[in-house]
Amino acid sequence: MLVVALASSCTTTTTFNSSQEECDYALHYVLDKANESTLSKLFFRITETQTFISDDLSFILQHADEIPGIRKLLDEWTQSMSRYTLDWFEGFTTYTTSLAKGLQFDDPQKMVLESDFSAALTMESVYGESILSYVKTTLKGADLTKWDEVAAQYNAWTKTRMAMYGEENPSLGDVDIVDDMAAYISMLYFEDLKASETLLRTTPDPNADPTVAKVFGLD
């Protein structure tokens, strides 16, 4: 039995009576569920929303109506990447699911009390670089010729604006689109994983697993 002091306007004490084994079970349970939810959201965000432009490169979209032909090139780029995503996402799903199931928690009780997304934080800490590397390696198999056309058109426009009006615009320079997209997808994955875990751990569910409900105080 773990006795925890909670800080507030006055000090109170509450009893946390879930064992390490129960906490470990509950954390893995919500992590698995959060991963399932995250993968569904992520697939939608990088296919149905038709972006494939990271926040760091959003300046391209901001100027898209001013750059001749770039809307068409952007459409072709997103269509190409959407088709490719259908091929690699199944492998990504299997990979992250396996990592989540095999993740070890050093102190499950402490993790339950630390934050509402401590399992996702541990997943990111332990496997963040591995997931980034996996996405990067996978994206290297994509056809990037459409991106090369987008970059060439955008860079030509920036040079023209500078020559004619002395106007400076962000440059793509030597942007590696594989590195950029891998970082973006990994960021979205962990962002959604934390949000999904938080929702599962703070929302009462009449059909919830009894052990999980007990550990997170939802019973």
Question: For each predicted feature, which ranges?
Answer:
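Mid-length scaffold segments of soluble, non-membrane domains
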Residues: 78-145
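N-terminal Sec/ER secretory leader and immediately downstream segment
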Residues: 13-92
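Non-transmembrane, aqueous-exposed alpha-helical and coiled segments at domain scale
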Residues: 12-24, 113, 197-200, 214-219
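Sec-dependent signal peptide recognition
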Residues: 1-3
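An amphipathic alpha-helical core segment
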Residues: 134-182
